[in-house]
Amino acid sequence: MSEINQTVTRRPFHRRRKTCPFSGANAPKIDYKDIKLLQRYISERGKIVPSRITAVSQKRQRELANAIKRARFLGLLPYVIK
């Protein structure tokens, strides 16, 4: 009585790549005066959320970071949220 070992081969799981929310026809423009938009990309502690979480492209992430920093400098956004 020989036992046949069958290994179960699983297909690899590929997570679908998210698209950049700032690319496309109806995409919002990144502006330092648009506080509601900028607050979506700031964590609860006031830090800028990385692009691997928000799926923002590298170019738009730099623009977003500069807009957040400019809004902080002008007093529109806080540096730290307590």
Curated annotation (Swiss-Prot):
Keywords: Ribonucleoprotein, Ribosomal protein, RNA-binding, rRNA-binding. Gene3D superfamilies: Ribosomal protein S18 (4.10.640.10). GO terms for biological process: translation. One of its GO terms (molecular function) is small ribosomal subunit rRNA binding. Pfam families: Ribosomal_S18 (PF01084). Belongs to the bacterial ribosomal protein bS18 family. Binds as a heterodimer with protein bS6 to the central domain of the 16S rRNA, where it helps stabilize the platform of the 30S subunit. This is Small ribosomal subunit protein bS18.
